UniProtKB/Swiss-Prot annotation:
Name of the protein described by the UniProt record: Large ribosomal subunit protein bL36
One CC-aspect GO term: ribosome
Family: Belongs to the bacterial ribosomal protein bL36 family.
PROSITE patterns to which the protein is assigned, alphabetical: RIBOSOMAL_L36
Lineage of source species: Bacteria, Bacillati, Cyanobacteriota, Cyanophyceae, Synechococcales
InterPro entries for the chain: Ribosomal_bL36 (IPR000473), Ribosomal_bL36_sp (IPR035977)
Molecular function as annotated in GO: structural constituent of ribosome
Keyword set includes Ribosomal protein: yes
Cysteine disulfide partners in this protein: none
A Pfam family reported for this protein in Swiss-Prot or TrEMBL: Ribosomal_L36
Sorted UniProt keywords: Ribonucleoprotein, Ribosomal protein
PANTHER family in the record: 50S RIBOSOMAL PROTEIN L36, CHLOROPLASTIC, LARGE RIBOSOMAL SUBUNIT PROTEIN BL36C
One GO biological process term: translation
């Protein structure tokens, strides 16, 4: 899980979603998981 100021899709499988007011990226590749914070 990477915590970043700006979250971006790193591949075509990445999905940008909102959970509990946070912007997150979920992906089949665990290295691409990101959270805004």
């Amino acid at each position: 899980m990477k915590v970043r100021a700006s979250v971006k899709k790193m591949c075509e499988k990445c999905r940008v979603i909102r959970r509990h007011g946070r912007v997150m990226v979920i992906c089949s590749n665990p290295k691409h998981k990101q959270r805004q914070g």
